[in-house]
């Protein structure tokens, strides 16, 4: 049986890494020949999770077509967020919870996308559907991904399914949901040792919005001012990315995990889209986005609609 690789998006977050590991566990138990891999560096938050549950990180790959003919995507479907040579392989499965865009295949596939807060909420259901018991460490990974994607069940992306799954998985994993969740988020929000490049690439995604090419990077922080103190350096690096990638807009979002607000730094030729979308005025290239914590639900669709109306 020919091996398939399972991976999440570039600049992987906790859900991307954990979903690849978890789905590989389930598929292997169902008799498939698969390997979880990653398309980028693991974040401090994800490192905390893997260390806590004693799970080895997936292997890093730059390309996939040199290894396999078929791949499985988790936590993404848009081509520009996937492996650089994704066009050279056949996508046979997708498990995701994001919008579907820039995606087509020449062959039929298994495509499962649900409007939930996290990919592992879907994967938990798939264990049950296939009659496979969830191991303690896999429960821990699934729980961690839900905590990460929903900011400990506080994000507007969080659904009743995510809440129910989190409580059940916490019990299987043997952890206190609130205490573990806060420790995990704080580990991810410690940005003191991060370089400017790391801050901008830890959790960054590119999107096509109408005719505009947009990149949105996001970090979680306990004190947003620690990050904003480096605004000059951040803007220099953002402008370099805009020139290199021919971006129309680069938005860097710093989310306060304690107060559930964000500050956005916006650069590029299309910053008026941010002002129009959120009814704000950028002062010194930045604005407070009250109550905004989710890129998926509160930034991407809002900006997409704004660009299409421009």
From Swiss-Prot:
Catalyzed reactions per annotation: diphosphate + H2O = 2 phosphate + H(+)
Residues where Mn(2+) 1 binds: 9, 13, 75
UniProt subcellular location: Cytoplasm
Protein name (database record): Probable manganese-dependent inorganic pyrophosphatase
InterPro entries, per database record: DDH_dom (IPR001667), DHH_sf (IPR038763), DHHA2 (IPR004097), DHHA2_dom_sf (IPR038222), Mn-dep_inorganic_PyrPase (IPR022934)
Gene this chain is encoded by: ppaC
Comment on bound cofactor: Binds 2 manganese ions per subunit.
Enzyme kind, highest EC tier: hydrolase
Pfam families recorded: DHH (PF01368), DHHA2 (PF02833)
Gene Ontology MF: a single term: manganese ion binding
EC number: 3.6.1.1
One of the record's GO cellular component terms: cytoplasm
PANTHER family: BNIP - RELATED (PTHR12112), MANGANESE-DEPENDENT INORGANIC PYROPHOSPHATASE-RELATED (PTHR12112:SF22)
């Amino acid at each position: 049986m020919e091996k398939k690789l399972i991976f999440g998006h570039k600049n992987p977050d906790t859900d991307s890494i954990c979903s690849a590991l978890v789905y590989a566990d389930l598929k292997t138990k169902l008799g498939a020949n698969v390997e979880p891999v990653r398309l980028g560096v693991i974040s401090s938050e994800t490192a905390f999770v893997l260390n806590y549950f004693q799970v080895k990180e997936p292997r890093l790959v730059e390309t996939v077509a040199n290894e396999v003919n078929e791949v499985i995507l988790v936590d993404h479907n848009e081509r520009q967020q996937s492996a650089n040579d994704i066009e050279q392989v056949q996508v046979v499965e997708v498990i995701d919870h994001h919008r579907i865009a820039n995606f087509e295949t020449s062959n039929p596939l298994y495509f499962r996308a649900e409007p939930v807060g996290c990919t592992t909420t879907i994967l938990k259901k798939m264990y049950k559907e296939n009659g496979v018991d969830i191991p303690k460490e896999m429960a821990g990974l699934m729980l961690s991904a839900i905590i990460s994607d929903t900011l400990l069940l506080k994000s507007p992306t969080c659904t009743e399914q995510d809440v129910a799954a989190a409580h059940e998985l916490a019990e299987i994993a043997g952890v206190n949901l609130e205490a573990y969740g806060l420790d995990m988020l704080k580990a991810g929000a410690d940005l003191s040792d991060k370089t400017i490049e790391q801050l901008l690439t830890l959790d960054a995604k590119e999107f096509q919005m109408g005719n505009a090419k947009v990149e949105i990077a996001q970090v979680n922080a306990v004190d947003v001012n620690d990050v904003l103190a480096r605004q000059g350096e951040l803007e220099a690096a953002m402008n370099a990315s805009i020139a290199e990638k021919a971006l129309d807009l680069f938005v860097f979002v710093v989310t306060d995990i304690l107060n559930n607000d964000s500050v956005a730094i916006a650069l590029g030729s299309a910053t008026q889209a941010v002002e129009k979308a959120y009814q704000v005025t950028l002062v010194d290239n930045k604005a407070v986005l009250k109550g905004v914590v989710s890129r998926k639900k509160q930034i991407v669709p809002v900006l997409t609609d704004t660009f299409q109306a421009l």
